[in-house]
Amino acid sequence: MSQISAKDVKNLRDITGAGMMDCKKALDETGGDMQQAIDYLRKKGAALAAKRADRDAREGMVEIKMTADHKAGIILELNCETDFVARGEDFTNFTVALGELALAKCISSPEALMTLTLGEAYGGETVDDAIKTMTGKLGEKISLKRLVYIDAGDGVVESYVHPGAQLGAIIHLATDQPDAVRELARDLAMQVAAAAPIVVDRSFVPADYIAKEAEIYRQQALEQGKKEAFVDKIVLGRLEKYYQDVVLSEQFFIKDSTVKVSDVLNEFRKKHQVKVDVIGFVRCKLGE
């Protein structure tokens, strides 16, 4: 068995929120394997949350740019150290410039954007050099955390950025009537930003992951003293709740909590005689 260090225990506590003794025991029981220790704590009900809140979130800005015909778009996150700098004109303008460049050149990763050249406003420097220059000018570390480019083809992209530019989402719909679905697409982008789904529908959730979650729920129920005869029903109920949390089509619609997103899509198709499906989306929350 590997030696369990105090640092390992602290790291596990930071990840799970569980007590020090629970973390020590989990690592002992799993031979020091961090992922197995996390699963162990979840099964025992000792983990307080699957992920931490935004305590370690950096400051910065989420930027979204789309082409005029809404056939393509980008979403990016640029980080700095303080809210003061994030709200400043220099940082804001620089973020916008990066978004415009990424969209114009169809760039889909931070690494690819770094090699491109900015315009005269930034001395014709590469993005990499311009970030270094901006770091010196503002006196804070500036870093491009993420960047995603979406090409909708014959479909449409739409977006939503929450006031303050710390949260945004961009969504891709396949449709035979792009102009007709723009308002719906924006509502769905807002849904993604607010409700934080992970996948479009159940088919995107790996079967092995669901099996693992089901086993965790089963062990939790047994640890709570639930009777074996009721455990399967409890597991199914918790899986349904999980789907409602992470699957876009099964979430309740933010504009009408009596219907699900799937219902909204079906009703829209019937009412407007239009083909429309959600292909994908990207949600970006500062610091996550």
From Swiss-Prot:
The record's Gene Ontology cellular component field reads: cytoplasm
Q: Which Gene3D superfamilies match?
A: 1.10.286.20, DNA helicase RuvA subunit, C-terminal domain (1.10.8.10), Elongation factor Ts, dimerisation domain (3.30.479.20)
> What is the protein's species of origin?
Pelodictyon phaeoclathratiforme (strain DSM 5477 / BU-1)
Q: Where is this region: Involved in Mg(2+) ion dislocation from EF-Tu?
A: 82-85
Gene Ontology MF annotations: translation elongation factor activity
Q: Which Pfam families match?
A: EF_TS
Keyword annotations from UniProtKB, A to Z: Cytoplasm, Elongation factor, Protein biosynthesis
Q: What is this protein called?
A: Elongation factor Ts
Family matches, as CDD domains: UBA_EF-Ts
Which family does the entry's similarity section mention? Belongs to the EF-Ts family.
Q: Where in the cell is it found?
A: Cytoplasm
